[in-house]
């Protein structure tokens, strides 16, 4: 095995937060200059970097080959220009540490090493070439409660493994589980620990992170612990059994309202034919009171998980597979479009926010106080009350320091107003509409999938889910309707914001709203 160039192997200490070495800082005391605590070899000295496998909000994953052994791995390359503040640097370093910390778990993707150069941080890890969880189920064409029980057993075993080592995943969703290979018996592996945190018993967290459908109610209420991972696994189980999420609405805010107050539906098809034991487990994983929710260990001891005779082996209704296909396809198309928009935002746009930050930060301290925010809002003509300004302040202040730093300010102001601006939607639509016909066809979607390194097995479903007039293609109005519906993907590293932070962006950038 390659020696670990990051020097960040796990030491089994659950309270590992304390050992998180801060990256070096520039002489001026500003943004860090590196993520890793010491210099590493160049990744290309050891690996040949090959084709693109996929692209996320913060990094691109490539196939890479070990020059010494010929073994194939995955290399996630994170551009340092996307790390806007100290907290972003620390997040990447923490992700590397957590991957080392969990590397002995059989269902966690194994890290091989981390490298850094002037422009990128590279994380080399085990290659999982077997595709995403839902894609495998859909490709099979049928599955049973017993098969669903086996999948949830694996997912919750990962959660239990994380919690036993003092790690909270915080972004459990089907897209973050990949099969190691295309083999029928390939193990399922958890990936993407970019939002994960070290914790110790009794710790409570307040930053709102995760992905809308899967986020626990206590996360939205800004006071949560590891129990939130069990809720997310419960959402995955619900989707596996019926093909749609338990809490659904047309907008992100609507999804959150449903999560906080909505009723679980066990009446619609196929629930009447699902076993009582499965429904009991779902209820107890999706209990809104985290103190009464099952722990990961208790889930693994539930009869539906433990006893093969309890989970029926008869095929689940084929309509569930059809829904699952649509749900998965919709996520992929929207994610591609979101990435196109994120990549198209210019330095000038962020530069404008930088100037706005400087204008409000009158003492050049690098942070905005309540008084500075109040004065800044007054200067742009806002008539908010002190109470409303305080609410905005608390919503944008991710680390609860009482001030807003540059990274928090960018995250709070560079969000939905950019996504929903007409020119950004036009630009994203044009990316897919290669021939400029005004329609996105199946061939154009196939080409886009290849450019993003995505499997294009379910292109018909991608189109069908968005195509309101059933003409077999997507026009601009259908595309924008999809983009403005409840957000299908995660908003990434600390950028899933509540409405107060969206309002902060709108108030400070009225011309962009």
UniProtKB/Swiss-Prot annotation:
Keywords, sorted A to Z: ATP-binding, Calcium, Cytoplasm, Kinase, Metal-binding, Nucleotide-binding, Repeat, Serine/threonine-protein kinase, Transferase
Q: What class of enzyme is it?
A: transferase
Q: Where is this region: Autoinhibitory domain?
A: 311-341
Source organism's superkingdom?
Eukaryota
- UniProt-annotated binding residues for ATP: 53-61, 76
Where do the segments described as Disordered lie? Answer: 1-33
Q: What broad class describes the main subcellular location of this protein?
A: cytoplasm
The entry summarizes how activity is regulated as: Activated by calcium. Autophosphorylation may play an important role in the regulation of the kinase activity.
Q: Where in the cell is it found?
A: Cytoplasm
A biological process term (GO) from this entry = intracellular signal transduction
Tissue expression: Expressed in roots.
Q: List the active site.
A: 171 (proton acceptor)
Q: Which SUPFAM superfamilies match?
A: EF-hand, Protein kinase-like (PK-like)
Binding, Ca(2+) 3: 433, 435, 437, 444
Q: Where is the EF-hand domain?
A: 348-383, 384-419, 420-455, 458-489
Report the sequence similarity comment from the record. Belongs to the protein kinase superfamily. Ser/Thr protein kinase family. CDPK subfamily.
The entry's function note states: May play a role in signal transduction pathways that involve calcium as a second messenger. Possesses calcium-dependent protein kinase activity in vitro.
- The name on file for this protein is Calcium-dependent protein kinase 24
Species of origin reads Oryza sativa subsp. japonica (Rice)
